[in-house]
Regions:
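Bacterial N-terminal signal peptides
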Residues: 34-42
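Compositionally biased, low-complexity intrinsically disordered regions
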Residues: 14, 20-22, 41, 130
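Bacterial N-terminal signal peptides that target proteins for export
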Residues: 22-33
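SH3-family beta-barrel domains
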Residues: 45-61, 71-75, 82-123, 131-139, ...
Length: 169
């Protein structure tokens, strides 16, 4: 598939040329659509899910160490990056709160956080298995592996077990 542009006394037009059954097909698309597509794809490329890897991280109001500390989070706290400024990430969390964190405090580790009150963590991936412990909303875990809709998780303190994916973000 090729891309050819045509310059004239009208808005920029793109012609997409493809070959189908030994015949050339030319499709004309206007720059507005292509511009829209580029903006959408650029925004998607920036969006990235990361995890706090430091024992504790300060969440700040802006991209600087002298910005106010809004709150603190613990290890394995998952974030969704919405903007980058230098060495800082602006993010949204599971409660749709936003803040800034320095890139040295995050990594690409797979992690989840409980989104419901009183979530059971079990010995094996089934509701029929023994409950090892129960956690409140907002507790982060590293994901070790998955089996169907179940996640084998580990807390920063070393506690492990299985949790259903409907209970986490």
């Amino acid at each position: 598939m090729g891309l050819v542009t045509a310059w004239a006394d009208r808005p920029l037009t793109f012609y997409f040329i493809s070959m189908k059954r030994d015949k050339f097909i030319i499709m004309k698309r206007y720059s507005l659509f292509l511009s829209f597509l580029i903006v959408i794809l650029a925004g998607t490329a920036m969006a990235e899910r990361l995890t706090i890897v430091a024992p504790v991280a300060n969440i700040r109001s802006g991209p600087a160490t002298n910005s106010d500390i809004l709150w603190k989070v613990e290890k394995y706290y998952p974030i969704f990056v919405i903007k980058k400024s230098g060495s800082w990430y602006q993010f949204r969390d599971f409660e749709k709160d936003t803040g800034w964190v320095h890139k040295s405090l995050v990594g690409k580790l797979k992690a989840v956080i409980t989104k419901k009150d009183l979530c059971n963590v079990r010995s094996k991936p089934s509701t029929k298995e023994k409950i090892l412990f129960t956690v409140e909303k907002g507790i982060p875990f590293k994901v070790l592996k998955s089996k169907g809709h179940w996640l084998n998780i580990e807390h920063a303190d070393g506690d492990r077990g299985w949790i259903h994916d409907s209970l986490v973000w």
